[in-house]
Amino acid sequence: MAKKVEAYIKLQVAAGMANPSPPVGPALGQHGVNIMEFCKAFNAKTESLEKGLPTPVVITVYNDRSFTFVTKTPPAAVLLKKAAGVKSGSGRPNTEKVGTVTDAQIQEIAETKAADMTGADIEAMKRSIAGTARSMGLVVEG
């Protein structure tokens, strides 16, 4: 008989840096999941990513307290800030520009996000990411 799903937990955890402190510990603890087991598995799965990069994860908790998880690609905003070399987006994106991204960088981010985004094709994904960049106060070149 298949295991019954008890809960889905969505978190953003720094790649390679999962530990039992908040937000991971409380979110998993309330469902009775072995927190250290998750932390070890998550850190092993994300060791190929840049350490500290915020990585969305969806954890499926079953009624026998076992779990599975799926990692997603980092948010487009995080990848854009990294590409532009800025710490945060602009508070006033229409008047105050904080950095620049090139078309090649947007192409690279679109290819990275292709697994998670539901865009029809790579060009649609590029337009979506360019829109995110503009709303953060980044200038898109190209």
Swiss-Prot record:
One of its GO terms (biological process) is translation. It holds the Pfam family Ribosomal_L11_N. It comes from the Bacteria. Keywords: Methylation, Ribonucleoprotein, Ribosomal protein, RNA-binding, rRNA-binding. Signal peptide: none annotated. PROSITE patterns: RIBOSOMAL_L11. One or more lysine residues are methylated. Coiled coil: none annotated. One of its GO terms (molecular function) is large ribosomal subunit rRNA binding. The keyword rRNA-binding applies. GO terms for cellular component: cytosolic large ribosomal subunit. Forms part of the ribosomal stalk which helps the ribosome interact with GTP-bound translation factors. Part of the ribosomal stalk of the 50S ribosomal subunit. Interacts with L10 and the large rRNA to form the base of the stalk. L10 forms an elongated spine to which L12 dimers bind in a sequential fashion forming a multimeric L10(L12)X complex. This is Large ribosomal subunit protein uL11. It comes from Vibrio campbellii (strain ATCC BAA-1116).
